Each structure stands twice: as C-alpha cells, then as structure tokens.
C-alpha cells in the first residue's frame, strides 16, 4: 500500500476516534443504549432506533460524531486515492519518443543500419521513397526483402508522397496512396512532404487524410510543412513536422521556436503531434538538439543528421545513427 494512504488512514482513524470520544462526553450513559447508526442517502448522517421503553430522542450527540467518524474516513480515503489514479492514467497513456528516419536510399547497407538500430529497443518510423513516391510497378525483389527485414526488426514504415504545398492535384496524391496500399504491403501510413501550413488548404489535406485513414493498417498520417501550421491541421494528422532545417538554426532561433511549444497543461496531449528533423548537425551537437526538440518543443518524432542541406540531404543516413538511437532510447 502507498505510504501516503497509510498515513492518511492512520490520521483519519485517530482524528475520528478523538471526535467520537469528545462526543461521548456529552452522551448520557444512564439512558437506554441505541442501535448502531444506519447511513442514509444524501444526508451524510445517521439515525437511531430508540429502546421501546423510551420516547424517540432527537439530536443525540454521540451518533452524530460516530457518523462523522465514518464519513471523515471515507472522504479522506477518496482524496488519497484521487491523485494516485491521475498519475496512473498519465503513465499508461504515454508513448515512447521515436526516430523518424528519411530512408530515401535504395535497400542495402543503410537499411541494415536502421534494422540494427531498432534491435537496441528504440522505436523507429522509416520513410521509404522508391521514386519520389511509389514506383508504379511496385517494389522490386530488393525492396521486398528489406521491407520484410525492417518489419521483423520492429520498424514501422510509411510511404513518401509529395503534395507541392497543396498545389498538386489531390487525385494524383490519392493515387500514390492507392499504389502504396496495393503494392507495398506492411506499410503503416503515409508521409506527406511539402505540406501547406495555411488554413486555406485544410480542406485539401482533409480529403487526403480521409483517404489515408481508409487504408487498412494506415495509422500514421505525417504532415511536413517544416514550420508551425494552422491549428486545424492537428485534427487531420497523426504528426506534424514543425521544424526541418539546420540544427544550428534551432539553437540560434531558440526564442522564436519556443512559441511552438505547447503550454505545460497541453504538452502531454500534443507531444506526439509534433516532429522535428535537423540536418547539418555534428555528432557533438546531436544530443543537445534532440533534448531541445523533446523537452522544449514537445516533439514525439525526431531525427538529426550530419547530412548537408541541398538536394541530397537524405540520400545517406546520418553517420552517427547508432549513437542517436541510444540517445533517443534513453529519453524513454
């Protein structure tokens, strides 16, 4: 039993006994004894059945203090339990911080590295990108082999689809989603790149979101505007990448990015709605960037790489994936 409950129970018993003793000093011992009080509904008190040889008596002090003893103990016990129940709910509703890895390279050694990192216990979501989206013909034998390998290692995969900030035809976006769903078995959702942050495009992304959710097993719908979007996007995504830039910019513009962090009361609920990707970051700065992403910006999915900005940022994995996996795993 929790020590807090034990202390409160002892306190309730002692105080209740003192109250009952105090009430007994006002009780007339020469009168006929009464039956034990019965708790009544709504009043919180009790009443006694008098001895048949005596007329009914009202306002007898002793039973009042006895009833007070019972109810005092009851409410203190409830107060003792309430905070513990809250903590229990908070603990069981938490999720692990995960790595969000842009795996834009052809299956091979890099995929092996991701599988090995997952075996250490860190949770990983890998974004696969066969051809700036799905290959219309579906995965070749190498993709099939390595997708199975990642699944066996516990990695969740999502398919890359670009949206051109809402300018790409929604039918083309949904067609890519259909191709992934029909030809790339085992995926857990879609990563929507070049996503808009404007409220004017919410209808567009609602259409896409509903299409993603119609696919069996597609639990992830990740948007990548790379900045803080309109709040309406929270309802039509599982995660939103609110930072994609050089890690030094997260540090240099720390004050401006703090505004993206939810308030303390909201942080628990929004934690898994935010994601961050930092490139051009040395191994020595990696841990500090991750800690800022998680503790300040309440991000649930993170990735830091030493890949430089440009067309080929994610054509290779970060050189310190193993250390990064350990750093993220240690946060859970």
Swiss-Prot record:
Residues 26-60 are annotated as: Disordered. It comes from the Eukaryota. This is Spherulin-4. It comes from Physarum polycephalum. Residues 1-22 form the signal peptide. Keywords: Signal.
């Amino acid at each position: 039993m929790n020590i807090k409950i034990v202390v409160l129970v002892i306190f309730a018993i002692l105080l209740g006994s003192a109250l009952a003793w105090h009430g007994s000093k006002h009780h007339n011992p020469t009168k006929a004894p009464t039956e034990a009080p019965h708790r009544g509904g709504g009043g919180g008190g009790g009443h006694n059945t008098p001895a048949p040889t005596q007329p009914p008596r009202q306002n007898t002090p002793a039973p009042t203090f006895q009833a007070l003893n019972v109810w005092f103990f009851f409410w203190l016990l409830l107060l003792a339990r309430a905070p513990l129940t809250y903590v229990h709910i908070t603990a069981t509703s938490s999720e692990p911080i995960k790595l969000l890895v842009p795996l834009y390279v052809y299956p091979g050694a890099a995929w092996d590295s991701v599988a090995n990192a997952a075996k250490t216990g860190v949770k990983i979501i890998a974004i696969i990108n066969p051809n700036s989206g799905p290959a219309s013909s579906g995965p070749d034998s190498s993709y099939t082999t390595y997708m199975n390998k990642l699944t066996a290692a516990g990695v969740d995969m999502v398919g890359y689809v670009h949206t051109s900030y809402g300018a790409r035809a929604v039918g083309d976006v949904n067609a890519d989603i259909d191709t992934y769903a029909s030809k790339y078995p085992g995926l857990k959702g879609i990563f929507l790149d070049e996503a808009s942050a404007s409220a004017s495009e919410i209808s567009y992304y609602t259409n896409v979101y509903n299409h993603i959710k119609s696919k069996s097993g597609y639990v992830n719908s990740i948007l990548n505007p790379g900045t803080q979007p309109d709040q309406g996007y929270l309802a039509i995504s599982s995660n939103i990448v609110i930072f994609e830039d050089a890690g030094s910019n997260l540090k240099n513009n720390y004050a401006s990015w703090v505004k993206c962090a939810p308030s303390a009361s909201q942080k628990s609920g929004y934690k898994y709605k935010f994601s961050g990707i930092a490139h051009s970051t040395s191994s020595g700065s990696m841990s500090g960037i991750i800690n800022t992403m998680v503790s300040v910006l309440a991000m649930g999915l993170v990735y830091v790489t030493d890949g430089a900005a440009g067309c080929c940022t994610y054509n290779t994995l970060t050189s310190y994936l193993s250390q990064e996996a350990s750093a993220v795993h240690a946060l859970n």
